[in-house]
Regions:
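Mid-length scaffold segments of soluble, non-membrane domains
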Residues: 64-92
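Short low-complexity stretches enriched in small and charged residues
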Residues: 40, 61-68, 92-103
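Stable alpha-helical elements in mature extracytoplasmic
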Residues: 31, 36-40, 73, 77, ...
Length: 194
C-alpha cells in the first residue's frame, strides 16, 4: 500500500493560494502545503490500477484550479480525480455516512482543523487532510501524510492516538471534534463500477 509523506518533499514547489497572490512566505512546497495532494495520490493507488505520482498530482491541482486557495480544494481535485480515473467522488459532513462508505471498501479523505476555543489541536495547528482507511467500531485506521516521530509527542497530543507507522489509530470522537470546524469534512472516493 502506497504511503506518501509530504515531509519528504521540501523542494517540490506547490504554487497555491493563486487567487490571493500566491502562498504565504515559506509555505510554497508540498512539505508545507501538500497534504491533500499526498492523500489524492494514495487514493488513486488504492482504488485503481494506476498511479498518480506526487509531481503529477501537483500539476493536476494547478491545471484544474484546485490550488486557488490555501493548500488544496478537495472538492475541485476530487472532481478531477473522478474525471481522469475510474473513481466515484462525493462529500458529506456526516461521520456515519463516511463510516458506511469505508465499510463498502471506499476511502475517505478527512479535513481536520486546528486549535480553537475549548479544543486542543490533535492532528494539526491549521487545516490538514488525512486519509481514513477503515473503522472497526472503535478506531479509525488513518494515513496521516504529515506523520513524524515528533508530531504526536507534543504536549496535548500524547496518548490521544496510537501509532504503528505508517498507520495512525484514532477514535471516532477525536475525528469528529477535529473536523467539526470545517465547512466540508469528509470526501468520499470509491472504485467506479464498470
Amino acid at each position: 500500500m502506497l504511503y506518501v509523506n509530504q515531509l519528504e518533499y521540501p523542494h517540490l514547489t506547490y504554487n497555491h493560494n493563486t487567487l490571493n497572490g500566491g502562498p504565504p512566505e515559506g509555505r510554497n512546497s508540498v512539505k508545507t502545503s501538500g497534504c491533500g495532494l499526498c492523500c489524492a495520490s494514495m487514493v488513486v493507488d488504492q482504488l485503481t490500477d494506476q498511479t498518480l505520482p506526487i509531481e503529477d498530482c501537483v500539476r493536476l491541482s494547478e491545471e484544474t484550479g484546485a490550488n486557488q486557495w490555501i493548500g488544496t480544494s478537495m472538492k475541485v481535485l476530487g472532481k478531477a480525480l473522478s474525471e481522469r480515473y475510474e473513481i466515484d467522488f462525493s462529500y458529506t459532513n456526516d461521520i456515519d455516512e463516511a463510516i458506511e462508505h469505508l465499510a463498502k471498501g471506499g476511502r475517505v479523505i478527512v479535513l481536520v482543523g486546528g486549535a480553537r476555543d475549548g479544543y486542543a489541536d490533535l492532528f494539526t495547528k491549521r487545516g490538514h487532510y488525512m486519509l481514513l482507511l477503515s473503522y472497526d467500531g472503535e478506531e479509525f485506521c488513518i494515513l496521516d501524510p504529515a506523520l513524524s516521530d515528533e508530531k504526536y509527542a507534543e504536549e496535548g497530543r500524547v496518548g490521544r492516538v496510537r501509532i504503528k507507522p505508517p498507520f495512525l489509530y484514532s477514535s471516532k470522537e477525536e475525528i469528529v471534534l477535529a473536523a467539526e470546524a470545517q465547512k466540508t469534512r469528509y470526501f468520499l472516493f470509491s472504485r467506479r463500477k464498470i
